[in-house]
């Protein structure tokens, strides 16, 4: 099992979620946040924005689903500009459903 953590532009979240749902991946956790990447913020006129709004999507998948889900996120989130985001893949050693006690995702 893997945890896909995608940090994306908030205005692309609906496109990403629609893409994931249409492909059979309806489960996710969404966290609104702020941050910046390598670009170090954004200057508009005389105003410098040190931190920009971002959304973190957490999606737990089986190992054989990682490439498909990452591809869906990349194709839905990309604008071709700085600030499109980053995707991290982390191993999940165990997962439990609180209500039932079942293991796995």
UniProtKB/Swiss-Prot annotation:
Pfam families (alphabetical): P-II
Superkingdom: Archaea
Any GO molecular function: enzyme regulator activity
Keyword terms: Nitrogen fixation, Transcription, Transcription regulation
Cellular component GO terms, alphabetical: cytosol
Biological-process GO terms, alphabetical: nitrogen fixation; regulation of nitrogen utilization
Its biological purpose: Could be involved in the regulation of nitrogen fixation.
Family stated for the protein in its record: Belongs to the P(II) protein family.
Name by which UniProt lists this protein: Nitrogen fixation nifHD region GlnB-like protein 1
Originating organism: Methanothermococcus thermolithotrophicus (Methanococcus thermolithotrophicus)
Lineage of origin: Archaea, Methanobacteriati, Methanobacteriota, Methanomada group, Methanococci
């Amino acid at each position: 099992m893997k945890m896909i953590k995608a940090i994306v532009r908030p205005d692309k979240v609906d496109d990403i979620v629609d893409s994931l749902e249409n492909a059979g991946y309806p489960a996710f956790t969404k966290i609104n946040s702020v941050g910046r990447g390598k670009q170090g913020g954004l200057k508009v006129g005389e105003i410098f924005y040190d931190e920009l709004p971002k959304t973190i999507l957490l999606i737990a998948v089986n190992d054989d689903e990682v490439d498909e889900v990452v591809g869906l996120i990349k194709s839905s989130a990309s604008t071709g500009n700085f600030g499109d985001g980053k995707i991290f893949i982390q191993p999940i050693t165990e997962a439990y459903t609180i209500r039932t006690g079942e293991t796995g995702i």
